Amino acid sequence: MTRDHFRSAQMFAEAQKYMPGGVNSPVRAFKAVGGDPIFFLRGEGALLFDVDGNRYIDYVASWGPLILGHAHPLVVRAVKECAEFGTSFGAPNELEIELARLLVEALPSVEMVRLVNSGTEATMSALRLARAYTKREKIVKFEGCYHGHADALLVKAGSGALTLGVPTSPGVPEDTARNTVVAGFNDLEGLKELFARLGEEIAAVIVEPVPANMGLVLPRPGFLKGLRDLTAAYGALLVFDEVITGFRLSYGGAQNLYGVQPDLTCLGKIIGGGLPVGAYGGRRDIMEQVAPSGPVYQAGTLSGNPLAMAAGISTIKALAEPGVYEALESKTLRLARGLEEAAARAGAEVYITQTGSMLCVFFQPGPVTDFAGALRSDTARYSRYFQALLERGVYIAPAQFEALFLSTAHTDEHIDRTLEACEEAFRFAFSG
């Protein structure tokens, strides 16, 4: 059954001459699962095709943006038509207005929005704005929540549950990390203790409302509302990082699904339809502090570039059609339940989480409610599972602690074939 990956291996060897590790984002190097990364040639719907001619059912979806699948005709047409008029102007264009309007209309908490080029830019800019607005310096983040690679957010917990952050990457100054406080996700009581101690110094709490970078961890009932109430009581801002969940869990995002309105929202991925994009937005009185309306500086050469705007507009309009999210939820539930049954038949001890069109298979009995729980997963078994699926034509995240994504392009046939492959992969992963 071994597939030929000769051209991919050649390309990886060549890539390592010119790029650190041969990739432009670390997870792509397959370090967490072993072997060499696959080089892809094209995508079509729910399928990916590599440079060696192998075909895969794709559940990575470019790490989430491709909710309509690869090369969706509406998105491709929009980008082609836009490119005929130019790829970038470095000046205002009408498409910026249209995308901004769609975002404001979809998210009740967002009255104004600033478009940027990535999720990292969005979170970095939102936290600068929060600090300026509140005139405070400390930021609270949660263990296991990823908010991009800005220095202030590349921190981990220290020796205690409620400690100041310490750098998790060389090159991050300790002085920068000291203003980031790390708390446990889903631990509202612990957060209350933290605010009792530091509340007057905290500018903002930033959170993935549904974390998708420690696997997929669901918020406990009342946790998000508790964050809203606590931050409001202390005059801190609540920032939802919806770079992944925005327009993924519902039309708008997790805040629409859970009925909790943050002060600021960070977006990315889906709102660019597969092109580089980010955005941050929120209450008018806060957003009017951003230059040139106010003193908080943020800028970008390619911010609001027409190609990303066109791709995002066409994607969001397609998602606004009746029944789209219901259909996505239905097929994802079918896959999740099928995986549970396949694992049981194979004697595989796994714990599956699912919401909307996202899911995760933790290689442990569960439950998983926080970062510490996620870390109990058997990453060696996950690696065997990943490699077995790759050989059977199913492409999932090359790391245990990532979510899987479905798209409107996935069919019942794709799911049936996936479940058949997964049962075999479970047997292989738990055979040794």
From Swiss-Prot:
Q: What family name appears in the similarity comment? A: Belongs to the class-III pyridoxal-phosphate-dependent aminotransferase family. HemL subfamily.
> Where, per the database record, does this protein carry N6-(pyridoxal phosphate)lysine?
K269
The chemistry this enzyme catalyses reads: (S)-4-amino-5-oxopentanoate = 5-aminolevulinate
Name of the gene:
hemL
Cofactor entry:
pyridoxal 5'-phosphate
Record GO biological process: protoporphyrinogen IX biosynthetic process
PANTHER family for the chain = GLUTAMATE-1-SEMIALDEHYDE 2,1-AMINOMUTASE, GLUTAMATE-1-SEMIALDEHYDE 2,1-AMINOMUTASE 1, CHLOROPLASTIC-RELATED
The entry's protein name is Glutamate-1-semialdehyde 2,1-aminomutase
